[in-house]
Amino acid sequence: SLRFNSMRVYLHDLLWEMKDEFLINFEKFLSICEENEIKPIIVLFDDCHRANPKLGTQYLPVKGIHNSGWSQSPGHKIVKDINRGCLSELKRLKNFSPGILDLYRNDLRILLWDLYNEPGQFGIGEQSLDFLELVWDWAFEVRPDQPLTSCMDGSIGEKIIALNSEKSDVITFHTYEANKLEPTIKKLSNFDRPMICTEYMAREFGTTFEFSLPIFKKHNVGCYNWGFVAGKSQTHFGWETILKLKESVENKDFVTDIKEIPEPKIWFHDIYRMDG
């Protein structure tokens, strides 16, 4: 047993269009967590990976490509539209974000709300600032009992990072490079707030468990490694494989049998194979 007592899980705004079914599944998930003494961090929005999310049948995994099916929420197109003053999606998004926060505002099964993962990533930069400001405003209208956060290191743009540092109840950050881990902790400790590293552990960059865990313990910092089981998300492959995504899709190099998922010589993220 790894003795994990928490996990970080992403929701998606589009699922609010199937609210009743979504909430049934979310309740099942929270019940399973509670039975296993796990309190999750819940992530609402995300600027990373595929830019055009949709309901229905999802992309097949692309063989050997890191996170080939991961979809942004709400997606860069909508975020850019909001930045330009086109607000046609705001009502729908506001139904989702304050809606889920309000329903679970007093729920002791949830540890923390991570409102927006890595705003500014994947080339959008500070065009995400306007939407991020709205997300923070909506969250403070509800003001759930659980702490609120959005990461600092991991986000892109000075104004975005400044906003997250001002608003976050808990300082969260993402560090995958071994030489940056302890300096980042020392820098962020100046905020004098509880601190959690919500993403780390890239073997290729040196942030192995053996290297990282003593540092987190030394500074009393909570930590969440990326990845658990090497499955269809294939995050045991490195980020550089994302550059091959378009070519691999054109060649239809999809995983149609989950048993066909390949393995790199050295895993990037993840801990277990699918058979445990």
Describe the function of each predicted region:
Residues P194-G276:
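Substrate-binding cleft of secreted/luminal carbohydrate-active enzymes
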Residues S1-V170, H174-T175, N179-E182, F191, ...:
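Active-site mouth of glycoside hydrolases
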